[in-house]
Structures are given as structure tokens and as C-alpha cells.
């Protein structure tokens, strides 16, 4: 397992092969990831705890996904994950292109 600190929380990669990657994402309260898309990466997210603030496409499409909810993100789909007043824990399973991130907006100036 590999823990990677992020400005919004951390990731724990617990499986990595040439065909898929599985990781946990811990999003700190009142934090969010960048508004982004992936050219090739495809991912499915399972909400383990907390209330995921989800943006798909433009900002008017923000919704909340609770524990047990599943979100599929296809290549090219603009998205952002975030947390409200309490942390969010996600499980992500994706294709292995971990560096395939095009950031459109980022609170941390990356």
C-alpha cells in the first residue's frame, strides 16, 4: 500500500496492476479536488462515508452522493469531488493512467 498526501486530504493506493488501480480517497472537511477531466482514464467511485459533493460538467450540476452511492466518470467528462462540513471517504477503481489529469480549475494552484 502507498499513502500519498494531497492538499485536500490523502489517497491510499491498495492495488495497482497494468489493467487497473484501486485506491481510497480521504477528502478533508470543506476541501475539494480540482475541476478536471481525463483523456483516457475511466473511474468508478464508491462513497464509503460522508456526503460527497459532486460536480459533473458545469457548476449548476452539483449534487450530493451519500454512503453506498456509486459514480462512474468516463474519459473526457469534466468532474470535481468535494466534502462539506465533515470528511468524505471514497473507494476508486480506475484504469491505470494515474497521471492522466487535465486540471481546469484548482484551489491549490497546481
Specify the residue positions occupied by each region the protein language model found:
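A short, N-terminal "cap"/entry segment at the start of jelly-roll beta-barrel domains
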Residues: 1-23, 34, 103-110
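Double-stranded beta-helix
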Residues: 4-6, 80-110
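Conserved short histidine dyad/triad with adjacent acidic residue
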Residues: 23-40
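Glycine- and acidic-residue-biased ligand/ion/polar-headgroup-sensing regions
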Residues: 40-53
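Short acidic-glycine-tyrosine-enriched beta hairpin
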Residues: 58-78
